[in-house]
């Protein structure tokens, strides 16, 4: 999904500007890019804000009101930036914090109403595929298989592939914010015996890696 912030600003030579927004469990990023007629691009500006949208959400299953308000406030500014740069389109992606929260759909409706930005909430596997496309596009051609790992706030994506195609991919619910919220005391940073035992049980998920990397 995409949202036209302003009328198409493509120049006579076919150049156009687009905004790309990535809403994660911890950070919110905006990249403004000029797309040239030959398909190449130039990065015009990049912005990153630590909105901590997923803070506490993985414990309760709901996004907190203060986290949502903080995120919407930053998104308003990003929408304004897209207008200033004459972006003809905004591509906005939301990941683990939104897709796992019971109130995620309601939050996305609020975002559209308050900012005009229409987000696409992607699955874990689609997130892994998009990460692979981004990373592999910068690799030299090779048929050798590689393991791509992206550790985010709410999930970890893994892909096995070469520079041309992926062979297997998966997404695990093992992000740094998720694990910190679930197992560590938010004030002292310590971990109780009960939570340590639960953390050890979570290691069972790593057995999924064996099937992923076995080609």
PLM regions: where:
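Conserved phosphate-binding catalytic cores of ATP/NTP-utilizing and phosphoryl-transfer enzymes
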Residues: 2-16, 123-147, 207
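Gly/Thr-rich phosphate-binding beta-strand-loop-beta motif of the actin/hexokinase/Hsp70
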Residues: 11-41, 135, 141-172
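Short, ordered loop/turn segments at secondary-structure junctions
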Residues: 95, 124-126, 163
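A glycine-rich helix N-cap at a beta->alpha junction
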Residues: 116-122
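Single conserved hydrophobic/aromatic residue that forms the stacking wall/gate
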Residues: 204-215
